[in-house]
Amino acid sequence: AKTIPSLISRVGHIRVFAAFASVASIVVLLHSIIISPLTWFILRVITGFSMVCLYTIAESWLNDRASNKNRGSVLSIYMIVLYSSMALGMFFLNFSKPENFQPFILVSLFMSLSLIPILLTKKKAPRFKTISGMTIKELFEASPMGMVSAALCGISHSAMFSLIAVYAASMNFSIFEISFVTFLI
């Protein structure tokens, strides 16, 4: 996350968003070409970093556009749309066999589609003052419980979102049932 502000200050929100959406789109396609657990691990790390960048840019842009009066509503709607999209996206598993390359193309397509509203906007990108960041040590010293809690929540959510489908498959659920279980989570 410390890399993002310096990138934004150099080339702007729109270009950084476009760059990381493109990286995420490319990396998703690479999953269908290279079938290797180690490679997929590396690709997932790259995807995760790209998604952090995309979320940071989108949320900072929304935060800049919202007033103090409507910020909570704007960010609430954003989160509802975000989580609803992720939940409904699970049903795309039913359109193709998971071992085929089509799901990867579909995800890449949606990543590429995310660029259109940002690249075609007439609105100016937000301009933020450069703020000083915190080192991980400073963050831990300021809020040890907060940092540990955030890390544990991140790990547990990642495990749950990543492994619930694997667990459902091991219980011999159909693809529809797996997508429904992941939808509910």
What is each model feature region?
Residues 2-13, 97:
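Helix-to-loop junctions at the C-terminal end of transmembrane segments
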Residues 15-29, 108:
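Structural signature of the two symmetry-related core transmembrane helices
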Residues 33-35:
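Helix-breaking motifs and short loop linkers at transmembrane-helix boundaries and internal kinks
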Residues 38-46:
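Paired small-residue
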Residues 45, 140-159:
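Pair of pore-lining "gating" transmembrane helices in MFS-fold secondary transporters
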Residues 108-128:
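C-terminal membrane-cytosol helix-exit motif in multi-pass small-molecule transporters
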Residues 162-177:
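Short amphipathic helix-loop junctions that connect adjacent transmembrane helices
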